[in-house]
Amino acid sequence: LAMHMDGARIWHAAVAMGIPEATIAEPFDSLSVCFSKGLGAPVGSALVGSRKFIEKARRYRKMYGGGVRQAGIIAAGALYALEHHRARLADDHREARRFAAAVAKMEGLRVDLERVQSNIVRYEVTAMSANAFVDACHARGLHMLPGGHHGVRAVMHLDVGPADVDAALAIIADVLAAARA
């Protein structure tokens, strides 16, 4: 039985675990990687596998009308992201941990700090529904995703620096204060 890995976030996983991407991918027959999630390329994914597998994938892509003109431009963006942005992924992890630590201290929010291992922070809103919380944050310029009735997901990335995290925390504190008023 062949195994495929959705490796969209493999770059962050490798940095978080302190191991090469190849070590993560080794048990799989194929994997897909994404150059825009985490690395910050404007667009682009790649399929990795044996020569036979890739030849078959190319044939299917062609049969279904898939294809990319000027693929070199996309490849250049992906290569730039690999060469210039991979090393800074640890910054995203650090900011995620800092964000989570601050969230953990806020009344009306709950986060398991042990689960914050990369650039994604999942936490719970106990002061209101996740949708109401996310909507109130969005109205103030902060974009996060609700997940279930109380869950919220925040993601740190290339375009989120320390000042942005501070601003996000201020908005969250403001939303919680308004909910208590």
Name these PLM-found stretches.
Residues 1-125, 131-140, 144-160, 164, ...:
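Conserved PLP-enzyme active-site core in the AAT-like
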